[in-house]
Structure formats: structure tokens, C-alpha cells
Amino acid sequence: MHAKINPKKVEMFNLLKEFLDGKDSVFFLDYRGLTVATLTELRNRVENEKGELKVVKNNIMKRVLKDKHMEGLDSYLLGPTAVVTAVDEANVIAKIFYEFVKTSSLKVKGGFVLGEVYDEAKLNAYSKLPTKKESISLFMNVLKAPISKLARTLKALSDVKDVKV
């Protein structure tokens, strides 16, 4: 005898599978105690950074993760769970979570970033990394510093020569 599968659950499975398609980072949050307004604000901030947030049923999400070969994440699927995905600059989205953690009851459970399982502590450290723009800016400043010093030295030499003449 075959157990009849609920079509709503199959549909939810397919939607969650699609939700994870093409995403290289997935985060798990405990939203217990958040007001609707706070959760909506979190969702909007995540979407502004090209991420997506969905409240999920843990058992269905476990099956989706297994189907996607994303192992080692079951421990993050306990209690109320919101799943956030990111395509680019996942640490920017992680920064958003930790801003909310400071002022609300939001808890970061863990995540899956570029094929690796991150616990809460590792995600917290990851959220403190500079963004792509900040990294490029830092790199440009490092490159620019010796050139600026050379330009100032040449200018000083030029000024000295002008004084002697």
C-alpha cells in the first residue's frame, strides 16, 4: 500500500527547490518573537540586497536540502525557521541579520555559504568581512599610496629646483 502524498506538500517542495536554485548561500534564522512589522522590515532589507526570505516548514526544507545535496544542515531546522538566500555578496545580507539581532529577538542559526556549512559563530565573523566594494576601495588605496608619495616627492623636488633658479 502506498501512502498518498499531499499535493500541497509536493507543491511546497517544488517551490522551495526552485527557491534554492542558483543560490550559493543559504541562511537559517529563528524568527520566534519577532513582530510582523519587524519580520517585514527584515524581508525588505534582505530584498534590497538581492536576497530572498521565506518562512518554511522544517520537514519539507530538510527533504529539499537532501535533494540538493546540501548536507549537515538538519540541526538548523528546529523550531520556527526563516530561510534566506543570497546570490551575490552574502556577507552583506549576513550583516543585516546581525543588525537585527542587536535590536530584536532574531537569532541566527547557521548557514551554507559557497558549499560550506557555517555555524552561528562563523557566520558572525563572515558578516564582519568587508563587502566587495569596500575590498576594492581598500585595494585601490593600497595601490594609490606609493604613487601619491612619489608624486609628493617629485613635487617637492620640483619646488626646490624652482627656488634655486
Swiss-Prot record:
PANTHER family: 39S RIBOSOMAL PROTEIN L10, MITOCHONDRIAL
Protein name (database record): Large ribosomal subunit protein uL10
One Gene Ontology molecular-function label: large ribosomal subunit rRNA binding
Organism of derivation: Borrelia turicatae (strain 91E135)
Protein function: Forms part of the ribosomal stalk, playing a central role in the interaction of the ribosome with GTP-bound translation factors.
GO biological process, one term: translation
Pfam families assigned to the protein according to its UniProt record, in alphabetical order: Ribosomal_L10 (PF00466)
UniProt similarity note: Belongs to the universal ribosomal protein uL10 family.
Cellular component, GO, one term: ribosome
Top-level taxonomic group: Bacteria
Record bears the keyword Ribonucleoprotein: yes
CDD domains named in the record: Ribosomal_L10
UniProt key word Transmembrane: no
UniProt keywords, alphabetically: Ribonucleoprotein, Ribosomal protein, RNA-binding, rRNA-binding
Subunit details: Part of the ribosomal stalk of the 50S ribosomal subunit. The N-terminus interacts with L11 and the large rRNA to form the base of the stalk. The C-terminus forms an elongated spine to which L12 dimers bind in a sequential fashion forming a multimeric L10(L12)X complex.
